[in-house]
Amino acid sequence: MSTYQAATIVAAPNEFRVPFPPFVQISKVQFQREAGSRLLAASGWDGTCRVYEVGKLGDISEKLVFTHGKPLLTCTFAGYNKVAFGGVDHNVKLADIETGNGTQLGSHALAVRCMEFNPMSSLIVSGGWDSSVKLWDARSYGNGAIESVNVSSSVYAMDVLKHTILVGTKDRKIFMYDSRKLREPLQVRDSPLKYQTRAVQFFPTGEAFVVSSIEGRVAVEYVDQSGEEMMKRKYAFKCHREKDTDGTELIHPVHTVAFHPKYGTFATGGADGIVNIWDPFNRKRIIQLHKFETSISSLSFNEDGSQLAIATSYQYEKEIDPSPLPNNSITIRHITDPESRPK
């Protein structure tokens, strides 16, 4: 295991809150990655998918509130003016951001847990608790999934980079697929971490990916497994841990991972309410942000890496729930070069 070097804890003034976040658990936030876009999507257990326009100076307007009725577990932008979402009612839906009109693309047999978008092919990729990964054409409605493949167990985490789909499952398997040839996986491997997978994310270059787990650990794995030298480059490390007042180590799930689009550094968010930004190349922690009120449920950098969306929602990790429950929030943090550039 590798140990990251510590950095100064920062309570920054350059943060502002998004008004009117989802009222119940925030399942995902995502900045649109279109060049020049300022849009941010958020899904929640209150059954809403919300789209905001986020200005550079903290000015925010709400462009869309799509009320689904059932808890939403995921969302993703699907092109310039569309957002897709899914949840516990098994359905995959698509909404037009300008008009607010929505349509159902199809469904899974169980809850839709993950969704991502491939702009190169205009395909929405969904992963469900029914152990399936499905592809949907964002340009045509009502034709159902254009392709589907079964994995070993429920999909818990997913990422898409160009045509490659990365899937983490309940049974701790990691699958990689080419969306143009979905029938057979490019790779199947065991997770390098011993406990349940919470997030998977590709490096922006696609040469490697990150896996996080419920046991306060993160692993860096390389796609190319050929040769002893490549195997030496992979590593894992402990994070999101703290000492209790009696000296007991508290280990927190690492719920979310997000990569900086310019520098290839990445942020992690945990049940300890902490956001860390890491340098995976030099194996150092660049910065630790101040402690938030409750668990970090989702993170997303904007298209140029100058802003980080931080969603906080209590995830019911504690044996005794706090009363009252902490408020949900979405914070936009301005990210500077020294906070995100490799050391």
Swiss-Prot record:
Its main location: nucleus. GO terms for biological process: Bub1-Bub3 complex localization to kinetochore; cell division; embryo development ending in birth or egg hatching; meiotic spindle assembly checkpoint signaling; mitotic spindle assembly checkpoint signaling; regulation of cell cycle. WD repeats lie at residues 21-62, 67-105, 107-146, 150-187, 192-232, 249-288, 291-331. Residues 322-343 are annotated as: Disordered. One of its GO terms (cellular component) is kinetochore. It comes from the Eukaryota. The keyword Plastid does not apply. It is found in: Chromosome, Centromere, Kinetochore; Nucleus. Disruption phenotype: Viable, but with a reduced brood size. Reduced bub-1 expression and localization at the kinetochore which may lead to the delay in the onset of anaphase during embryogenesis. Defective synapsis with increased numbers of nuclei that contain asymmetrically aligned (clustered) chromosomes. RNAi-mediated knockdown results in reduced survival as compared to wild-type animals in anoxic conditions. The keyword Repeat applies. Keywords: Cell cycle, Cell division, Centromere, Chromosome, Kinetochore, Meiosis, Mitosis, Nucleus, Repeat, WD repeat. May interact with bub-1; for localization at the kinetochore and the onset of anaphase. It holds the Pfam family WD40. This is Mitotic checkpoint protein bub-3. Has a dual function in spindle-assembly checkpoint signaling and in promoting the establishment of correct kinetochore-microtubule (K-MT) attachments. Promotes the formation of stable end-on bipolar attachments of chromosomes. Necessary for expression and kinetochore localization of bub-1. Plays a role in synapsis checkpoint signaling inducing apoptosis in response to unsynapsed chromosomes and thus controlling chromosomal segregation during oocyte meiosis. It comes from Caenorhabditis elegans. Signal peptide: none annotated. SUPFAM superfamilies: WD40 repeat-like. Residues 334-343 have a biased composition (Basic and acidic residues). GO terms for molecular function: ubiquitin binding. Belongs to the WD repeat BUB3 family. SMART domains: WD40.
